Amino acid sequence: MDARSIAATAANKGFLTAATDVDVNFSKPKYFFDKNIYANRVFDSKGVADPSVEIQFGPNIKDWPAMSALPENMVLKVVSEIHDPVTTTDELIPSGETSSFRSNPLGLAEFALSRKDPEYVGRAKEIQKAQKAIESGECAGKAVPEVAEIMGVVKKKFPEASHENMGFGSTIFAVKPGDGSAREQAASCQKVLGGWANIANEYATKRYRSNLINWGMLPF
């Protein structure tokens, strides 16, 4: 279909129409290239940078939250179990309606496992309170009461463990997670919610396992 037939079809409200069926005298006007049409639509900042101007971010563009390094000792709580044969990255973090949150890490994380385990986010945030308490110099047991009971058992078996070399986080179990697209948000969303590991029988793809490692999570 040539350009004239496309124009004829558009003029005929979308009905396929050949250019020869339109009662019009076609002409061939001489074309003159006007670079201003393109120059006016493209921002070229080369050589005109102004450090004094503050970059204005939209309301849905957020910085990444602070993330702690992996501690020497960890207490992990399994906050979601998925026993399907395979868990896809689209189930770990859905696409579609979440696309507008790609520049908002915490906002995007609210959708993590929403189609598979809607309670996951709340449970992950609850144990994350213990880690945040440690980072702010407070008692993890006061922030999350069940941690106080766990610490009693931990200190009996591991006397060297203390709040100085210990961290608290969440993990999920899945039979075979990570099938599907290579979206790293499947791992990063768990990380910003306090996730420090995945437990699996096997991993569906090397790239998902690599994404976990790249985001400071242990692929057990």
Question: Which ranges hold each PLM region?
Answer:
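Fe-S-dependent hydro-lyases/dehydratases of central metabolism
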Residues: M1-F220
